[in-house]
Regions:
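Sequence/structural signature of beta-propeller domains
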Residues: 1-173
């Protein structure tokens, strides 16, 4: 809840966002926090490129929860080591920069920095599921990332390469 890009203790940006846990976990206490909200904001889609051990996460329009640094069209990446410890998530690509129109952020009021502060976020309510990125998935060979564009109601394929490319252009779509 709140402005994901806020900084300082006890702000929305300081709250936990990404957790990992062992595959064979059988009791409580095995999950580990790996990222704060300020690095990701609201995310929904997840995809795993096993060869490079990269977890992809897509931004998601959600009421009362702001976007991370990449905005509405962001796809983030986090390298997960063999010990399960990921690197801090970073922006892989904002799909708007490679020709995919997922719409704009419909927020008409700023979200509060304090996650306990009530807010109305009225501009978002009617647009959930109509703007931004929905689910994401990766091809079996790990070379293509598929994204659901809820704004244009399309499925897009992005050639991300395997091993993972470091930059993308419209020709990768």
């Amino acid at each position: 809840n709140g402005n994901a890009m806020s900084s300082g203790s006890n702000t929305a940006g300081d709250k936990d966002n990404l957790y990992i846990f062992p595959y064979d976990l059988s009791n409580d206490g095995g999950n580990t926090r790996r990222a704060k909200n300020q690095y990701l904001g609201s995310v929904f889609g997840l995809a795993w490129q096993r060869e490079s051990r990269v977890l992809f996460m897509s931004a998601y329009l959600k009421r009362h929860s702001g976007f991370g640094p990449g905005g509405i069209g962001a796809i983030y990446q986090s390298q997960i080591s063999t010990t399960g410890v990921p690197a801090t998530p970073t922006l892989l690509v904002n799909v708007g920069t490679i020709g995919i129109n997922v719409g704009t952020d419909p927020r008409i009021t700023a979200l509060p920095n304090d996650p306990k502060t009530p807010n109305t976020d009225v501009g978002v309510f009617a647009e959930i599921g109509k703007r931004g990125i929905g689910g994401i998935d990766i091809s079996n060979d790990g070379k293509d990332l598929y994204i659901v564009n809820m704004f244009e109601k399309k499925l897009h394929r992005i050639n991300i390469g395997n091993p993972l490319k470091s930059s993308f252009t419209a020709t990768d779509v």
